[in-house]
Design a protein with these regions (language model features):
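N-terminal leader/targeting and assembly helices and adjacent pre-domain segments
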Residues: 1-145, 153-154, 201-205
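Acidic, glycine-rich two-metal-ion catalytic cores of nucleic acid-processing enzymes
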Residues: 122-205
Length: 205
């Protein structure tokens, strides 16, 4: 289903463009202070706070729009509490908690900048890692808001649909077309997996 992640890709594009500008501005600000260590710590602290705020804002919009776009859907679209709980929970696919990971990335970026002469390279590396995490969690927000829409409307089973584009992994191929209870769907086999779910009438025996 080529359109399943259209909203996701729009959200990722918005966030990537914001992140590029924020990292560039942070790099320029740090350079003006000649990459003073304390200044780098302050610049990266502010940078990652702003990045996390951007993601929270756009992830919530994505979740709410995806919920309404999903058919069938209920009458309780995701709210901020829903999103914060999702981001604070341990994720079996990424193997970490988003709310802790962005802080770890902040600290790692600041440490890397302060411990090397290739400071611009470390800003770029930080951007790359942030963009990857943002993409993974945009997909997760899409999946979970879709499943919430199904559950709120009484859907009990879903079918696993693989992309079938020649790039899917062996696990995704093996799960293609399988029916799962909506509360017992196996975790996706890798971060960013774009297999998707559709309502199913009943479980196949």
């Amino acid at each position: 289903m080529s359109g399943f992640y259209d909203l996701t890709d729009k959200a990722i594009d918005i966030l990537n463009r914001r992140a590029v500008k924020r990292f560039e501005d942070a790099k320029d600000e740090a350079a003006l202070a000649k990459f003073d260590e304390l200044n780098v710590l302050e610049v990266t602290r502010t940078l990652y706070q702003d990045l996390a705020h951007d993601n929270q804002e756009i992830f919530l919009e994505l979740a709410q729009e995806r919920y309404q776009e999903t058919e069938p859907h209920g009458k309780e679209p995701p709210d901020l509490a829903w999103l914060l709980a999702l981001l604070a929970a341990y994720n079996a696919v990424t193997k970490y908690q988003y709310s802790h990971e962005w802080e770890r990335k902040r600290d790692r970026t600041a440490e890397a900048i302060n411990s090397t002469t290739a400071k611009v390279t470390e800003f770029r590396r930080g951007l790359s890692y942030w963009a990857q995490m943002t993409e993974w969690y945009a997909v997760e927000v899409t999946d979970q808001s879709t499943l919430k829409a199904f559950q709120d409307s009484g859907v009990r089973y879903v079918k696993w649909n693989a992309m079938n584009d020649g790039r899917e992994c062996s696990t995704c191929k093996e799960r293609e077309g399988k029916i799962y209870p909506i509360r017992s769907i196996p975790p996706k086999p890798h971060p960013g997996c774009r297999c998707w779910y559709t309502p199913a009438e009943k479980k196949r025996i």
